[in-house]
């Protein structure tokens, strides 16, 4: 799933020239979806495909109730220091995810989609807090490994076209990254408050480059993963 950040009444970051983050994220998100549609590996879906407002709750509810193999949230960064520039990648913190898992178990939610094997374990052990927590902790560990490995592929492609603001993966307690049934990451595609990056981010050519870099990384990662799984069977 591709999540173009912000939208509608929520413009996201706005620079001194009036460029709104929501417009950049939507354009890159649509371009990425179009690229992914050309591959049999993917079935891409957008959280929004126009300038509409989609609340964080609605985005999270969709993830809860549907099978989403991976979520990529597209954003553009901002800073009061106009010289700051570059792309970065973020995933959720351990503390935030463990809190989400504990809340799920405590509230006994039943409307969350899980893979069949995990769903069966949870259903059979409804009242076993420790077993459910162990299963979900293990799933989170697997998700985190996937996020870390995929981030390496994306960094490899992004650094060909843009300076990296942070050369390592970053962690943040963000709601969009904290669904317990979906691996996810947030990509900051550059700073709209930086004159040079803002100038590039406005253009179709540069938006295409960003979308293509993410697409190539996703294709390479999932192809390698598929080949690895085939070798191990």
Curated annotation (Swiss-Prot):
- The answer to whether keyword S-adenosyl-L-methionine applies is no
The protein's UniProt keywords, in alphabetical order, are: Cell wall biogenesis/degradation, Hydrolase, Secreted
The broad enzyme category this protein falls into is hydrolase
- Cellular localization per UniProt: Secreted
| GO CC, alphabetical | extracellular region; outer membrane-bounded periplasmic space
Superkingdom, natural source = Bacteria
One GO MF term: N-acetylmuramoyl-L-alanine amidase activity
Q: What GO terms in the biological process aspect are recorded for it?
A: cell wall organization; peptidoglycan catabolic process
Pfam families, per the entry: Amidase_3
Write down what this protein is called.
Putative N-acetylmuramoyl-L-alanine amidase
Q: Which gene encodes it?
A: amiB
